[in-house]
Amino acid sequence: MSENELYFVIPTCRLRDVGETVEQYDEHFRRNGHTVRIIVFDDSSHSSQAKYYPQLEQTKTHNDLYYVGPREKEQFLAYLHKRLRDKRLERLVKDLFRPSYGGNRNFTLMYTLGGLMVSADDDMRPYTLMEDSPESLDADEICRGKLIKAGGNGYTRKSFDILRAFLDVLGKPVRQVPDNYERGEVLLDSATDLETNASVKLAHENSLLLRRGPLADDATVKMAQTFRSGTNDIDALDFVEMFLADESQKSLSDLNDVYVLVNFRPAVTKMNWRMDCGVAGYDNTFGLPPFFPTRLRFEDYIYRLWIQQPGIAAAHVDAAQNHCKSNYMRNPPAAEIFNEEVSNLLKRKIKSTVSRLDELTIAFDYEGEVTAEDAQEILDKISRLHARTLDAAKGAEPVRADALRVFAANLEKTFYGFEPDFFQQNLLRIVDDVVSVIKGSIELWPTLIEVCYFQKNRAGLPQTKVNNQKK
């Protein structure tokens, strides 16, 4: 695989801040001797693009920097509409690539067809936080981490050659994976539910454990990810739990705890229920399935299902990165919790009805039904959190008490006043819309892969080379 077939992509909706991400990863790649095309995929509006694109041009990089924003995306979609020549399909195409978590990532898949793609979100950084005195891992333990107070002692930044770690495994059969990789069926997180990856409860320390099982030597590593520190996979509910537990914390937007890695080692597995598209790499040589085109935070769940078919494997590579949680353009905590609860419901429903897995798509039979029991289970959980929040406000000092009461009020409003019928009605509407969009659009995906593969090799896809300064 030649270097010009390796892409580093940064999906973002925060063009204002992405320049710092670009420069840090670019410098990291230079220090490790890599030359790679960097592409920013921007979900901003035209007005935000006009306002903040000049800041991207002020960056200084060693590598060539490219940009795919609202204008380039419109050109891309216009080309697809022209090739398909069917007005009835235009809505499905727009759904696949609409501004959303999954829609923006689907552009990255098209633009990197035929190569290897390494992706990092705009709030990731090319270093990790590790404990100063790493402990040995237990047998079958792949990673251990813990929450500690931010700004304290006992941990330092460490950097690993990220691209080399991905290149060691992506697109290779398991038999060619380096010998230091552990091998097994799946990784189990001691702090999360296996199939939804949602936190079971706030855990101040967790481990990833390897479950031994069959893994074919000729299975190809199609996706991989680094480990990560900072916030790891902390759910919105976990942030609230940390806020409730820390009586010195005045605001939910403050982060007094940070996730630090104690130790880790690489592993290759048959399944991956911990898919983390924020720090992932993909073998996109022959195309991959689309991310779910949704504004809910489960766009990568399709990959956790897709990888279960024969001949495919996943890896946690020998590197780690850090997540610097940004509150800029982030939904309020109550909205994030609602997003996660709906996502977890959809994960369970879709997973239980999968009917087909193939090279580029999946199929499932779930049609979007939401029972009264489904809705009540969510309401019971959130109502308990609401009550605990109000109780905590009673004995808190004024600033913290105000923050707790505001959060409780937002929680009640977001969950439709905890009124069961009203909540179920709106939950059904949201779920039905998401499922309809997903099912309709992914059926078209293989055709679009074929169209884009031809055009990319013939004339390229619309993108702008950023006129920034070279180091």
Residue ranges and their predicted role:
Residues 115-129:
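Short beta-strand-to-loop acidic/aromatic patch adjacent to the donor-nucleotide binding site
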